[in-house]
Amino acid sequence: YDGIIHNGIIANDAELGNVNGLVDSMILPQVIDRSSLDTIVDSVAKIRGSYAMVIRGDDTAFAVVNYKPLYLLRKDGTIYFSSMERHLSPECLFGERPVPLEPYTAVDLRSGETRSLPRQENNKALVVCSGGLDSTTVAYVLREQGYDVSLLHFLYGCKAEPQEVTTMRHIGKHLNAEVIYQAIDYTSLSGSSPLLTNGHIADGAAGAEFASEWVPARNLVMLAHATAYAEANNFTTIALGNNLEEGGCYPDNEEEFTTLFSKVLDYAVADGRRVRIVTPVGNLMKHEIVALGHRLGVPYELTWSCYRGGEEHCGKCGPCFMRYTAFQRNNLHDPAIRELVV
């Protein structure tokens, strides 16, 4: 319609003036001011619904999307568009591929200039916190950065759950942060993790170098729950304690995992909402995390890392081994572990 190609649904076209129109897209030429990239962004703010649009201007063209996908392929002086990458891929030469427009973005197709569409954002951060060294440090990092921090702890039946619950209460009080508890039922899984059964827990370096205690899809499940809670309770940021050291043995601690999950979030929450994942210690090893937390005054004496339950850290399992070693490398005393016994 008048130089505008639209894929999606305009839910408020009648309110915008398309009272008797059968096709919602017919209202767009009246709504879209194509004078500049900024006026495009201002115009689409009036629309309630979904859209991936290509808009012809006087001497250029614009593309703008919310969550509807749009792929671009430049070939022989022509720009091809599609909502699916596979429609354009056969046209690509070796080494080429269609380029996706980032969700909630407008672009001037001649100059390449882009704008991000405004979304609902705030400084509320939901830290997925086990009460261990890494995620507790993350909570204090975000507080230092000015976030309004709340702690989300999952009850999934691990052996150290009673100790973790106590730890979370103390950390929340020290941080002056709300602590939210959510239960996840793993009891129906057969052949499950040693953390959930009476299976063997590896000790020392063996426990630190391989994911013997892997809980099936734990971080994926927890992130799905955290995303739902964040959206429902108006949190823009979800923070994780994923780090470089544990990425070596846990696939869901790899940076690529959080990068890919972050891409899903634009399609997992309501239109106009933003929920993002941050990993403030994602590029750090354990000893670097301890050094950072020490500077910030993190109360490591309150934290719990041990896979085994009990009144004290066992000093044997992989997490005990890793944290004790991390403190040693900083010439610091680990306030939670007297000594290693491996």
Regions found by a protein language model. Name each.
Residues Y67, T237, N242, W304, ...:
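Short secondary-structure boundary segments
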Residues Y1-E121:
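Conserved short alpha-helical segments that host acidic/polar catalytic motifs at enzyme active sites
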Residues A224, L302-T325:
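Local cysteine-cluster metal-coordination motifs and their immediate loop/turn environment
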Residues P29, T227, S262, F321-Y324:
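Short, amphipathic alpha-helical segments that act as regulatory/interfacial helices
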Residues G309-G310, N331-V342:
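Short cysteine/histidine-rich metal-coordination sites, predominantly Zn2+-binding motifs
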Residues V23-I27, R48, A217, V221, ...:
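Conserved active-site and cofactor/substrate-binding residues in soluble primary-metabolism enzymes
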Residues I40, G95, V298-S305:
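Short, surface-exposed acidic
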Residues E121-L296:
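ATP-dependent adenylation/nucleotidyltransferase module used to activate substrates
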